[in-house]
Design a protein with these regions (language model features):
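Auxiliary, metal-adjacent structural segments of Zn-dependent hydrolase domains
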Residues: 1-23, 87
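Short pre-active-site segment immediately N-terminal to the catalytic Zn-binding motif
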Residues: 26-44
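Post-HEXXH active-site segment of zinc metalloproteases
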Residues: 36-41, 53-90
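Short active-site segment of divalent metal-dependent hydrolases/proteases
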Residues: 44, 48-52
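Short, hydrophobic/amphipathic alpha-helical patches that form generic packing surfaces
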Residues: 87-102
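Pan-zinc metallopeptidase signature
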Residues: 102, 106-145
Length: 145
């Protein structure tokens, strides 16, 4: 796969004991070792965290707009992350992840990945993106991300 457009760091660690995260070093797990699509989607997801760091003004504008669209966003596992702020970030990230997956693996496989993740973690966030992707997409595009 040509993932160059979604690479924002080349410093990557693979650690089978860690939950994937983007900072301080982008770290991926081996949980989905037998599913290339899930591995690829996780890679794009974590790289997108780094992309938001590179565009703080656009990122802040998108979060402000999402707060208006989703004033009562779920907080806490498994529906979301540990804060509303991080959930707004994740709506952006998951939208970009879904669009990247569509380009890299096609709509059917991308949808299957999102469906799986909507039953795994950040459940509400992934379900919301599947339900109405363009609602978040309009915000992402309008903010310049």
């Amino acid at each position: 796969y040509d993932v160059s457009r979604w690479v924002h760091t080349r410093d990557i660690v693979i650690d089978e004991t860690e939950i994937p995260h983007s900072h301080p070093v982008l770290t991926l797990h081996a949980r989905h070792l037998k599913d290339d699509d899930l591995l690829l989607s996780t890679f794009v997801h974590e790289q997108t965290h780094r992309m938001l760091d590179e565009h703080p003004t656009e990122h802040a504008a998108a979060v402000r707009a999402l707060r208006k669209l989703y004033p009562r966003i779920p907080v806490g596992y498994p529906e979301g992350s540990d804060s509303a702020e991080v959930n707004y970030d994740h709506l952006i990230i998951i939208y970009i992840e879904y669009r990247a997956d569509q380009r890299l693996m096609g709509e059917l496989r991308a949808r299957a990945v999102m469906e799986f993740l909507s039953h795994d973690h950040y459940r509400w966030l992934y379900r919301e993106l599947l339900r109405e992707p363009e609602k978040v997409g309009r915000v992402v595009k309008a903010s310049g991300l």
